[in-house]
Swiss-Prot record:
Its cofactor is pyridoxal 5'-phosphate. GO terms for cellular component: mitochondrial matrix. It catalyses: N(2)-acetyl-L-ornithine + 2-oxoglutarate = N-acetyl-L-glutamate 5-semialdehyde + L-glutamate. Its EC number is 2.6.1.11. It is an enzyme of class 2 (transferase). It comes from Debaryomyces hansenii (strain ATCC 36239 / CBS 767 / BCRC 21394 / JCM 1990 / NBRC 0083 / IGC 2968) (Yeast). Belongs to the class-III pyridoxal-phosphate-dependent aminotransferase family. This is Acetylornithine aminotransferase, mitochondrial. Pfam families: Aminotran_3. GO terms for molecular function: identical protein binding; N2-acetyl-L-ornithine:2-oxoglutarate 5-aminotransferase activity; pyridoxal phosphate binding. Gene3D superfamilies: Aspartate Aminotransferase, domain 1, Type I PLP-dependent aspartate aminotransferase-like (Major domain). The lineage of its organism: Eukaryota, Fungi, Dikarya, Ascomycota, Saccharomycotina.
Length: 466
């Protein structure tokens, strides 16, 4: 067992760190039970984990995250394992990313084979897989009943990068009418990213205030209130409206279909680009290929952004545009060095095949029903502490209330081998792998039930060690 992390690591330029990490990873096995039976509080400062974090991680990484004393070392399917050989059932999937689970065998094979063949060649040249991925995205989207005017795809590396591209494309479309047509409308409780353009349409003071002033011309409307949009939209000035069909970070809020139909009509009447951000709710997460597949064609977007699940953990994003957007874009208007690289594109192509499959999507809906029934049962047991079950598919939330704090629930669940995350105003968010086994759903719900039961009796209690 690793007893100490040498002080000399800081004096040798980090040359010995890779070897240390390798030794640490190799000395722990995955022989623990399906879910640990005992409480597993976060590792103390003098543990292997504490030493690693305080000696290697914290001194050399920017302080932008508040993280518990947990160092993940490996994962398989719906389970993660840490440096202390603790096992966790993952109901978070890396924030709705690992849609096919951790260390998926086929994706591992694709990564290995393609890395040995060609990882990157830039967009100065074509490669074998970028066009294939774009073709599959457009074809499967139309065949699934989504974005009826889907035409072309821009490949990039992340969700915020996809939204930046979408906003640029919308600005270019607006300028084809007038230089004054540059304003954008976003919605309360939305989240579109942290780079400057995406941040500007993410109306959360916590994220925006430290970096103001932001991109000018952004108006904020109320979701599900079409009159609030009518007051802001202008044929002369507005170029884009951006919205998540199901808000994730903002609280797992599904937007009403009637509102989205009316919103699209407003956009058409005012020659405004409608952007759907399906970075979290898309690619099978809602039980359909896209969340907007549940909507009539009259509510379909002009631009669709995606990322997260597209690479199952490998960084990749994409922007799908209609013909009217494609027509205003010229060579040199936008670009990316890494976007559409052969490795990411080949992974994305495989993921799209899986999440477009009708049987796969039916199973997502069945798992959603199982989750919803279980969560409703928990909610009914605790009417003073749980309001409603929110969301669609496997993007679900529990609205907490009373003295039950979502941070306490997240910590309590983690201590008992279950990973969940928060969203919005005191909402517990559940976004597991789309292929999570039914028995894992049941076991995770049992842990969640016990944790909420104990916290509802004593919000600051510790889960039983027995």
């Amino acid at each position: 067992m690793l007893r100490n992390i040498p002080r000399s690591l800081r004096k040798d330029g980090g040359k010995r760190i890779p070897g240390l990490i390798s030794r640490v990873a190799n000395q722990f096995s995955t022989t623990s039970s399906l879910l640990n039976k005992k409480s597993i509080p976060d590792a103390p400062e003098d543990s292997h984990t504490g030493q690693y974090i305080n000696t290697i991680t914290k001194p050399f990484t920017v302080t932008t995250y508040a993280r518990p004393n947990v160092v993940m070392t490996h994962g398989k399917g719906s389970y993660l394992y840490d440096l202390e050989n603790r096992q966790y059932l993952d109901f978070s999937a890396g924030i709705a990313v690992t849609c096919l689970g951790h260390s998926h065998s086929k994706i591992t094979e694709i990564i290995s084979d393609q890395a040995a063949t060609l990882m990157h060649c830039s967009n100065l040249y074509h490669n074998l897989y970028a066009g294939e991925l774009a073709n599959k995205l457009v074809t499967n989207t139309i065949n699934s009943g989504g974005m009826k005017e889907a035409q072309r795809v821009f490949l990039c590396n992340s969700g915020t990068e996809a939204n930046e591209a979408a906003l640029k494309f919308a600005r270019k479309y607006g300028k084809s009418f007038s230089d004054d047509k540059y304003e954008m409308i976003t919605f309360k409780n939305s989240f579109h990213g942290r780079t400057m353009g995406a941040l500007s349409v993410t109306p959360n003071e916590k994220y925006q205030k430290p970096f103001a002033p932001l991109v000018p011309g952004v108006k904020i409307a109320e979701p599900n209130d079409i009159s609030s949009v009518e007051k802001l939209i202008s044929k002369e000035k507005t170029c884009a409206v951006i919205i998540e069909p199901i808000q994730g970070e903002g609280g797992v809020n599904a937007i009403d279909a009637e509102f989205l139909v009316s919103l699209k009509k407003l956009c058409v009447d005012n020659e405004v680009v409608l952007i759907y951000d399906e970075i979290q709710c898309g690619l099978g997460r809602s039980g359909k290929l896209w969340a907007h597949c549940n909507l009539p064609e009259e509510a379909h977007p002009d631009i669709l952004t995606m990322a997260k699940a597209l690479g199952n953990g490998f960084p990749i994003g994409a922007v799908m545009v209609s013909d009217k957007i494609e027509k205003v874009l010229k060579v040199g208007d936008h670009g990316t060095t890494y976007g559409g690289n052969p490795l990411g594109s080949k992974i994305g192509s495989y993921v799209v095949d899986q999440v477009s499959d009708k049987e796969f999507l039916l199973e997502v809906e069945e798992k959603s029903e199982k989750f919803t029934k279980g969560l409703s049962k928990i909610a009914n047991k605790h009417p003073d502490h749980i309001g409603e079950v929110k969301g669609k598919g496997l993007l679900l939330g529990l609205q907490l209330k009373g003295n039950l704090d979502v941070g306490d629930v997240v910590a309590k669940c983690r201590e008992n081998g279950l990973l969940v995350i928060s969203a919005g105003m005191n909402v517990l968010r559940i976004v597991p792998a789309l292929n999570i086994p039914n028995e894992a759903i049941e076991e995770g719900l049992d842990v969640l039930d016990k944790c909420i039961d104990e916290l509802s009796k004593d919000p600051k209690s510790s889960f039983s060690q027995s």
